[in-house]
Amino acid sequence: MVPHDELLRLSSLCYSTSTFEIDGIEVLVTQWDKYSVVAVRGTQMSWRDIFRDARATPYKSELLGWGHKGFLVAAEKVLQRLSIMSSIKGPYVFTGHSLGGAIALAASYGAWKRGWDVRQMVGFGTPKVFYRESKKLPLEDIAYTLYENGTDPVVKVPMFFGERIVKPQKIGKKKGIRKLIPCVNDHLLSSYEESLSKEPP
């Protein structure tokens, strides 16, 4: 498996470097040992990203089932592009931060459903993707890890989607009253980097 600190580095790198871009979704595909790593860029201050994050209406994808419309539609587009890139071979690992983590989560499931050899998915500050556990992720086939740093509020939304399928792994834990107060700074990629460096998996 690919070390989580390396996947965090690639999740950061894809904010500035990408292999392809489709409809504003930037994706970095790289090789790590025998794995093809697919890292999806997280939210930037663009209208496309803001609109994609906000499209939380429950939506039924033929491939992915019920979930967050913005994330599922984006994941379908990423899979469409990956499927025609003959240079990319499995086994696959998906990763991303924030919006990128959500798209990577949905894409990893879709890739597995299509018969691709998906081994691992690691998300950092990943919002909820699937609606009320309407789709069960293949936990027996794919090693899923979703990190929650401190009191990052993004991992809790959309709140009406119910409980998560994969329970977040908490890092950067706070004490006292601070653990009750959501902190947007805890969602920053730099905050995840700092916490993961202090608490390696």
List each language-model region with its residue ranges:
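Non-catalytic, mobile gating and regulatory segments of ester bond hydrolases
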Residues: 1-95, 99-201
